[in-house]
A protein has these predicted regions:
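Short helices/loops that flank or line small-molecule/ion binding pockets
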Residues: 26-27, 113-128, 211-223
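Short beta-strand-centered segments that line the small-molecule binding cleft or hinge
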Residues: 114-154
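Beta-alpha-beta core module
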Residues: 140-145, 152, 217-261
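Hydrophobic hinge/microswitch elements
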Residues: 186-241
């Protein structure tokens, strides 16, 4: 181990959380300590930090860094430092409102699939929970272990003051009269294709970290349509369900690297999340646990 656990944690948590201040809060130290440890890690690893579009990234030869991260991840799995988990905005409050012992959790703000799965691939994150089925890797993917937790029908949501709120027997032409939110092309290809076939997913929203103003907050204009299920509806009381069947089942899942799936700490996490899934499903008629 070339770099100490605290030194590399200061660097990688800054990359994960987006700032040294956020990393300091997660580590329970002051920002100057994080900055000092980060500088030390960068010097030992021979890389530098650059900021781009609100994200902190590394520049230089990262071969030694990747080797160190693998060693450090094994140390975390053996209990020498806290393991790291994050979730998307819809899954985090339900599954990680109480963080399991031995883990620290992010802010449930990482966007899309590419960024969080990149952090998993690079061993900055150890586990991720998200509500992005059917767009997650297949069960036989050689790189990823995906444990399905819950499933529920996806719904069209809008402001309670929307002209279609409370109306029955809506048609596709009714929906097409109004703007409908879309994420960047290719973020969720299966979901995108399905919704586009129904005249939805037309007005692109781009963000680098989840902000409610950039998603459910868009419905405050009284006309914009968005999407969710019973879990997201409970988190977004500013929305109402429209009478339209999207004929799409979405789902929450745990995602980890395939080579970590059999680690005891990961299996303990899986058991914790499966128990949470069963408890969550009991609260909603249309939410089903997978196991």
């Amino acid at each position: 181990m070339v770099v100490g656990l605290d030194q590399l944690a200061a660097l990688d948590l800054s990359l994960w959380m987006g700032s040294g201040a956020a990393a300091a809060g997660l580590l329970g130290v002051n920002q100057s300590t994080v900055s000092r440890q980060q500088r030390s890690a960068l010097g030992l690893l021979g890389v530098s930090v650059v900021s781009s579009r609100g994200e902190v990234r590394l520049r230089g030869d990262v071969e030694l860094l990747w080797a160190e991260r693998e060693v450090h991840q094994m140390a975390r799995l053996r209990g020498f430092a806290p393991l790291r988990i994050d979730a998307n905005y819809a899954s985090g409050p339900w599954f990680l409102g109480t963080v399991p012992e031995g883990w620290i959790a992010g802010r449930f703000a990482l966007p899309g699939l590419q960024r969080p799965m990149g952090l998993l691939r690079e061993r900055v994150l150890d586990a991720w929970v998200c509500s992005y089925q059917p767009d997650l890797p297949n069960a036989d993917d050689p790189d990823w272990w995906v444990l399905d937790l819950l499933q529920a029908p996806l719904q069209v949501l809008a402001s309670p003051q929307h002209p279609l709120a409370g109306e029955r027997r809506l048609s596709q032409s009714d929906l097409e009269r109004f703007p409908s939110l879309a994420l960047p092309d290719g973020w969720f290809p299966s979901t995108e294709a399905h919704l586009r076939q129904q005249g939805l997913w037309r007005n692109a929203v781009e963000f680098h970290r989840y902000d409610p103003d950039d998603w459910e907050g868009r419905s405050h204009d009284g006309v914009t349509l968005l999407y969710g299920n019973s879990l997201t509806e409970a988190l977004m009381p500013c929305t109402a369900r429209l009478d339209w069947d999207l004929q799409l089942i979405c789902g929450d899942a745990l995602v980890v690297r395939r080579d970590l799936a059999d680690q005891p700490a990961i299996q303990q996490l899986a058991a914790f999340l499966l128990a949470r899934a069963r408890a969550i499903a009991e609260r909603f008629a249309d939410v089903q646990p997978i196991h």
